[in-house]
Amino acid sequence: MDEFHRCGKEDSFWQQCFLYPLFFKEDLYAISHDHYLDVSSSSRPMEHLSSNDQLSFLTVKRLIGQIRQQNHSIVLFVNCDPNPLADRKKSFYSESVLEALTLVLEVPFSIWSKYSVEGMNESKSFRSIHSIFPFLEDKFPHSNSILDARIPYSIHPEILVRTFRRWIRDAPSLHPLRSVLYEYRNSTENLQRSIIVVPRVNTRFFLFLWNYYVCECESILFSRLKRSSHSRSLSHGSFPQRTHFHRKIKHIIIFSRRNSLKSIWSLKDPKIHYVRYGERPIIAIKGAHLLVKKCRYYLLIFRQFYFHLWSEPYRVCSHQLSKNCSSSPGYFLRVRMNPILVRTKMLDELFIADLITDEIDPIVPIVPIIGLLATEKFCDISGRPISKLSWTSLTDDDILDRFDQIWRNLFHYYSGSFDRDGLYRIKYILSLSCAKTLACKHKSTIRVVRKELGPELFKKSFSKEREFDSLPFSSKAAARSQRERIWHSDIPQINPLANSWQKIQDLKIGNLFDQ
């Protein structure tokens, strides 16, 4: 594959026109075979791994020959072998061919994605979720409106195949892809004759499909916004959710002035900022209300004409930043005014001026998190701590470590908020729930548990020093960090409680739209 990459730099046209012969390379299936065994060994016991898991290249060639037929029935995933291992053999060869198909498609896509968006010449890898917030702090306070939309999951398989034709001219290589997509659609029994492309399916093929789908949407969207908005700048950041392409892109695209600037869209310094985390894009706009309505209308038309997806107008929300909050990964986001007192001394006179700046204010959703803690049986619905009965069979150290880990992860994730009073309310709930769990285990009271285990035990587990022990700061810097917000670069995924709240929030919005 590395050799194919090197050849592709010299002749990219060969990549786009002759992908199909790669399906008959034995090295390709050796790679897919090893990857399949690695995944299987982690999910199956060792006694289920036998010598029968050997790849027959002749069987693979026959299977590819069947896929080449114009029959969209169960060609890829049907095995007529009557022996008891037929189901496992069927899955074995299916996964191997699917893995090989993904490897072939990933090579031209990785090259195409670098040049898919015009003007994107800077691409860096950021695996931390908190990398989204510095981008928001830099761009969003200067905007006055937000368009909140979500990338639709449902898409017809033929639409995906047609979009692949834009950058793959080798028609035979599209037949296996079409067969796989139609087979997946038929297996889900979808009445709308479409497939659901989600990044949470833990297979390499669907992760690639999601990355391609998102990149295709964004490349077309950016180019059209560039032509239609006539704005002077457009910045964007992309934060895929734990897929193969982790990146943050931030670049300014300068638009040429045209005669159309004399029209109604000749606004004073309009700007568009695009940021995406996972399947949720947010577009921040600085400009008049007409520009916001135009972008919102374009998003609906874009989905309808390019991907044949009908979306009701109210499914693309627009609201003003100064009056409403927007929910991002685990936070409520709003723009607040920050007054600054400036003193200037000139000769013998002292001038005092008040400057007001806008800044992003991330708010921790305390009440929803307490509701989630009540669902997990750490407290009741009013926030009163209760014992975690399912953990009473654990040792004392395990109980303390689990409660302490929940608190540290929660505080670590929400360290970017100025107001942490609500966080310490959650700390109180967790610490008292921990004490009640230990008391329930030993069939005694909290006072007896504190006396037997020592009063310093809970202070050690829930101390403020342990909240900042992962920071490479001195003690003075750690004390100062309690009054400041910190964005961490070591958070690979959203906090489970924050993720649960975000899903509930999205579900409420969806139900509100469906009414």
From Swiss-Prot:
GO molecular function: RNA binding
GO CC aspect terms: chloroplast
Any one GO BP annotation for this protein: RNA splicing
Keywords, in A-Z order: Chloroplast, mRNA processing, Plastid, RNA-binding, tRNA processing
Gene: matK
Keyword match Ribosomal protein: no
Protein name in the entry: Maturase K
Function of the protein: Usually encoded in the trnK tRNA gene intron. Probably assists in splicing its own and other chloroplast group II introns.
Upper taxonomic lineage: Eukaryota, Viridiplantae, Streptophyta, Embryophyta, Tracheophyta
Annotated HAMAP family: MatK (MF_01390)
Top-level taxon: Eukaryota
Organism name: Pinus contorta
Predominant subcellular localization, coarse grouping: plastid
Similarity section: Belongs to the intron maturase 2 family. MatK subfamily.
Compartment annotation: Plastid, Chloroplast
